[in-house]
Amino acid sequence: MIAVLKAGYLSLRPEHSVVAVGPIPVADFVGGEACVACHAAQTTAWQRSQHARAMQRASPQTVQGKFDDARFPYAGVQSTFSRRDERFVVRTDGPDGKLADFDVKYTFGVEPLQQYLVELPGGRLQALSIAWDTRPQAAGGERWFHLYPNDRIDHRDGLHWTGRQQNWNFMCADCHSVNVRKQYDATNGTYATTWSDLSVGCEGCHGPGSAHIAWAKDKPPSDARMGLTVALDQRHGAKWTIDPASGNAKRDPPRVGDRRSTCARNAMHGGRKSPKVTSPVDRSSITTFPRC
């Protein structure tokens, strides 16, 4: 009877099932460059992806906004975006509310908007609230806009670009970079944040790769995991549906163990947009997905 029930159960299992493949190996982060030799095609595809451009050092090749002495008024403050040789400079209200010049250190995202990170004392990277709409001009893009257009956010507000809620170390780093160590010093309120990959590299989804590299040298058949710390086979057969009660997306079936579906999208990071979207941050008409 047990054998019959087991056979019936197996026949009902989905085509892509979850199979136990052994214990999770202990591994260290090695950086995406270590993957290129064996995975050249995947690297080329990744270089064209938004993952590769989730965060980049500011340069003429990465900055999409027009830093041509463009001016943007908001809440009584006139901000100016300009170029000084290879530097991208924003003149805007600082932590004390006074106008000052700030160098853009990094770009943040590429579509449908690009934000810019400025470094403040104490190792803090802050995301400017004035961003560049990267959509085509015909779609209403190629312009500067404020993330809170209907408010009057000044330096005393927690949502001001110099505040905690716009702090990269605290709010953004874990998803936009790999192997982030925030290293916050509570005594003096400073950061000494480090990472192994600035953008979302291979190990951002696959986990630390040292054990996989060790496996690749000999490829022992006994290691069905191939030295990988994260399995990505649960993307097969999975569906995301909106819970009417919470408004959040729910995965069906739920994830099991250490396996991971592909990184899900959310409203601010490439979510599917309806034709009614009139702004790159129009939450009302963007299908949302949870973080992975």
Indicate residue ranges for each PLM-predicted region.
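Local sequence-structure signature of Cys/Sec-based thiol-disulfide redox active-site neighborhoods
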Residues: 25-40
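Post-cleavage N-terminal segment of exported redox proteins
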Residues: 1-21
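Extended acidic/polar, glycine-enriched regions
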Residues: 120-129, 134-170, 174, 178-182
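Disulfide-stabilized extracellular ectodomain repeats and their linkers
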Residues: 32-35, 169-172, 202
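Residue-level marker of regulatory loop/turn positions in helix-turn-helix DNA-binding domains and
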Residues: 23, 27, 164, 194, ...
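Primarily the internal scaffold of c-type cytochrome electron-transfer domains
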Residues: 16, 33, 41-109, 113-120, ...
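Extracellular/periplasmic ectodomains of large secreted or surface enzymes and adhesion receptors
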Residues: 22-23, 291
